Amino acid sequence: MSLDINQIALHQLIKRDEQNLELVLRDSLLEPTTTVVDMVAELHRVYSAKNKAYGLFSEESELAQTLRLQRQGEEDFLAFSRAATGRLRDELAKYPFADGGIVLFCHYRYLAVEYLLVAVLNNLSSMRVNENLDINPTHYLDINHADIVARIDLTEWETNPESTRYLTFLKGRVGRKVADFFMDFLGASEGLNAKAQNRGLLQAVDDFTAEAQLDKAERQNVRQQVYSYCNEQLQSGEEIELESLSKELSGVSEVSFREFTADKGYELEESFPADRSTLRQLTKYAGSGGGLTINFDAMLLGERIFWDPATDTLTIKGTPPNLRDQLQRRTSGGN
């Protein structure tokens, strides 16, 4: 992984009681040792794989103002991180989920893009076996379950200040409250809605195949093509590119998919992040409620699975063997 750390600082928030978060600030930056680089690379990997919300700085954002001064050389990175940790503490203390943790500020470069990553990581206790096969206590940073994380694409922010996607953050374990917390701390407003872009794409694909007068099998093949392309982009960490997707669908209609979306006013960006849960609807039907969970391949609708909208009845012909076995055992009086 081609990741280079420019500067990295660690501080700590300690929850002493229900009212107070104590601030512990480092007096120096961390050295970018191999261990530190590996840790940041893992955090970058984990963060990149998660669904994120997008935003942009408001004009009044204090963090943006101080970050801009730091980028211009008027404030050093350590002082910037110490002051920002203080503001972070003040915002986090407003919420009941405030547990403290290790606060990380890292300015790094990955594939010619500069980022500022801000994270609050839990420092957990565990056990380890030493070289003498003795069991000793140890501590570790819980990177895989980090959910208070934000990242600023510094390159995008400075070269394209009108962008609505240079700032990202995770939605976290308590849903909207974590999003609100980061909005307040970052001084940000909502930006690109990736989920809405993906929903718009799905609608455009359905309308595109309908206008091309494709039969059911052909429509499903197109949906599978779109899913395969989008999933490849997702797995490689790349965005959905309308131009590239349009080339994938070049034989479907005389009108290109890109021209179709532009003419019909779908308001899709030229490129946007893939949303896994939304894209899954291209190939599957899924839903749950009232103690019932149903998930099946889209190609089965009309073949083995039939829906009557008049009575809202779903008929399944041929149940999965393991389900059938359970039904048979229960109805025959077995366990």
UniProtKB/Swiss-Prot annotation:
Top-level taxon of the source organism: Bacteria
Say if the entry is tagged with keyword Oxidoreductase: no
**Location(s) in or outside the cell:** Cytoplasm, Nucleoid
Give the InterPro entries listed for this entry: Nucleoid_associated_NdpA
Identify one Gene Ontology CC term for this UniProt entry.
cytoplasm
| MF term (GO), any | double-stranded DNA binding
Keywords recorded for this protein, A-Z: Cytoplasm
Please name one Pfam family that this protein belongs to: NA37
* Family membership noted in the UniProt record: Belongs to the YejK family.
Q: What is this protein called?
A: Nucleoid-associated protein CKO_00588
Which species is the source of this protein?
Citrobacter koseri (strain ATCC BAA-895 / CDC 4225-83 / SGSC4696)
Lineage from the top down?
Bacteria, Pseudomonadati, Pseudomonadota, Gammaproteobacteria, Enterobacterales
